[in-house]
C-alpha cells in the first residue's frame, strides 16, 4: 500500500490527468479565509497542505468507507507578528466528494473553495508538531490532552520534497519558539518567587526595627507592684504589620489567669474511742473545680467525729479548725480523690493501745505481774510485824 501511494501520483502526473496549481498562487484555505468570514486569520503567509490521516504503522484510516482527507494550515492570528501561533483544520463537505471518481484522483484534485469548510482552530501552545517518518513524509500532531494523530503528506510528486522540507523547517522553528517561551516562563516564575521573598523579608526587617520604638513610647504598667506587666498599643502601627485583633480586650487591660492557692492542713486525731490515733497532712489545691471534693472530705470527717466519743470538752468545730504543728517523719504520699494528697504520720501511743497490749499478753506474764504486786504489798506488812514484835520485846525487857 505504501508503494502504491508513492507511485500513483507519478503516473497521474505523466498522463496529465490533473493540473497542479502554481506554487505562487495562494492555497484554497487562504482563499477561503480572504472571503471575509474569518477576518482575524487573514494574515499571510500561510503554510497549508493536504494530508490523509494514518495510524502509527502508516495504514490509512477510513471514515465512512473513505480516506480521511484534511487540509492543515499554520498561520498567525495577529497581523503584526510573523511567528505563527494558530493551527487550522479544514475538511471537504460530503457533496464535494463523488463516488465515481478514483480515490487518488479525488485526493490530489484541488477542491473548490465553496466546498472547503473550516472545522478546527487549535492554538499552537496546546499542540506539539514533530516529524514521525521523514521517508514516508509523515508528521505527528500531539494535543495537550495526550492524544496523538499521524498525518501523511498528500501532494504532487514534483512538489512533495520541497513542501515537506518547508514543514520540517516550520516544525523546528515552532519547537525553538516553544522552548524559549518555556524558559521565559521559568525565569518569570523564579523572579516572582524572589520578589515575594524580598518583600516579606523587608517587611520583617521593618517590623523588627520599629519594635524598640514601640516599646519605648507605648509601655504602661499595671497597678499591681508585684506583677509588673507591660502592654503595648499597636493601634498606630497597623499599616506596618497589617494584623487584625478580633478580641474585645481594652488596650490597657491585661488578662490575668486565676491564681491557685496551695493550702497545707495538718490535723491530729488522738481522742476518738474505738479508732486508732492517726495524724495526717492534707494538701488541697483551692479552686472552684474542687469545692465539691473538699465538702465531701469535711462531711466524712464529721461522720468520724460523730461515731466516736470525744474525751476533750472542746467542740467539734474547734477540734476540726485548730491546726497543730507537728514534726513530720516517715512521709508516705498517697493519692486521695482527684486533687487531694494525704500523708500518714507515725501515730503516738494512746492509753487504749496500752490497755490493748496488756490484754494481748499471755496469762503467765500477767500472773507473774500479779504475784510481784502481791509480794510488794506483803513486804511492808512483814516489816511492820517485825517492828511490832521488836517493840513488844523491848517493853517486856
Swiss-Prot record:
One Pfam family in the UniProt entry: GARIL_Rab2_bd
Its job: Seems to play a role in sperm motility.
Descriptive protein name: Golgi-associated RAB2 interactor protein 2
Organism: Bos taurus
Locations listed in the record: Cell projection, Cilium, Flagellum
Assembly: Interacts with CALM1.
Entry GO terms, CC: sperm midpiece
Primary location group: other
Superkingdom of origin: Eukaryota
Record keywords: Cell projection, Cilium, Flagellum
GO biological process, one term: flagellated sperm motility
Biased composition (Basic and acidic residues): 10-24, 353-369, 376-397
Family: Belongs to the GARIN family.
Segments for region (Disordered): 1-24, 342-397
Amino acid at each position: 500500500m505504501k508503494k502504491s501511494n508513492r507511485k500513483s501520483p507519478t503516473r497521474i502526473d505523466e498522463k496529465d490527468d490533473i493540473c497542479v496549481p502554481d506554487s505562487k498562487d495562494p492555497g484554497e484555505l487562504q482563499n477561503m479565509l480572504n472571503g471575509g468570514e474569518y477576518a482575524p486569520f487573514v494574515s499571510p503567509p500561510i503554510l497549508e497542505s493536504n494530508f490523509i490521516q494514518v495510524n502509527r504503522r502508516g495504514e490509512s484510516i477510513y471514515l465512512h468507507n473513505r480516506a480521511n482527507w484534511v487540509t492543515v494550515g499554520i498561520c498567525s492570528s495577529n497581523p503584526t507578528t510573523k511567528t505563527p501561533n494558530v493551527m487550522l483544520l479544514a475538511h471537504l463537505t460530503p457533496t464535494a466528494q463523488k463516488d465515481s471518481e478514483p480515490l487518488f484522483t479525488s485526493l490530489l484534485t484541488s477542491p473548490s473553495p465553496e466546498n472547503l469548510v473550516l472545522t478546527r482552530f487549535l492554538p499552537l501552545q496546546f499542540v506539539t508538531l514533530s516529524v514521525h517518518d521523514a521517508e514516508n513524509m509523515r508528521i505527528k500532531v500531539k494535543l495537550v490532552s495526550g492524544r496523538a494523530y499521524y498525518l501523511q503528506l498528500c501532494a504532487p510528486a514534483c512538489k512533495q520534497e520541497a513542501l515537506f522540507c518547508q514543514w520540517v523547517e516550520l516544525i523546528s522553528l515552532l519547537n525553538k519558539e516553544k522552548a524559549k517561551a518555556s524558559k521565559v516562563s521559568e525565569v518569570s516564575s523564579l523572579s516572582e518567587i524572589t520578589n515575594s521573598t524580598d518583600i516579606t523579608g523587608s517587611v520583617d526587617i521593618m517590623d523588627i526595627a520599629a519594635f524598640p520604638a514601640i516599646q519605648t513610647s507605648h509601655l504602661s504598667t499595671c497597678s499591681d507592684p508585684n506583677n509588673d506587666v507591660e502592654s503595648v498599643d499597636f493601634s498606630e502601627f497597623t499599616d506596618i504589620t497589617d494584623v487584625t485583633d478580633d478580641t474585645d480586650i481594652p488596650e490597657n487591660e491585661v488578662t490575668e489567669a486565676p491564681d491557685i492557692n496551695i493550702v497545707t492542713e495538718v490535723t491530729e486525731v488522738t481522742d476518738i474511742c474505738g479508732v486508732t490515733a492517726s495524724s495526717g497532712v492534707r494538701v488541697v489545691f483551692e479552686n472552684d473545680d474542687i469545692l465539691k471534693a473538699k465538702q465531701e472530705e469535711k462531711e466524712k470527717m464529721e461522720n468520724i467525729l460523730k461515731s466516736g466519743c470525744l474525751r476533750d470538752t472542746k467542740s467539734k468545730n474547734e477540734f476540726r479548725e485548730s491546726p497543730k504543728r507537728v514534726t513530720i517523719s516517715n512521709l508516705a504520699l498517697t493519692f486521695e480523690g482527684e486533687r487531694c494528697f494525704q500523708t500518714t504520720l507515725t501515730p503516738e501511743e494512746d492509753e487504749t493501745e496500752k490497755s490493748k497490749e496488756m490484754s494481748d499478753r499471755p496469762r503467765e506474764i500477767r500472773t507473774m505481774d500479779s504475784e510481784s504486786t502481791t509480794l510488794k504489798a506483803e513486804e511492808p506488812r512483814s516489816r511492820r510485824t517485825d517492828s511490832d514484835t521488836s517493840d513488844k520485846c523491848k517493853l517486856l525487857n
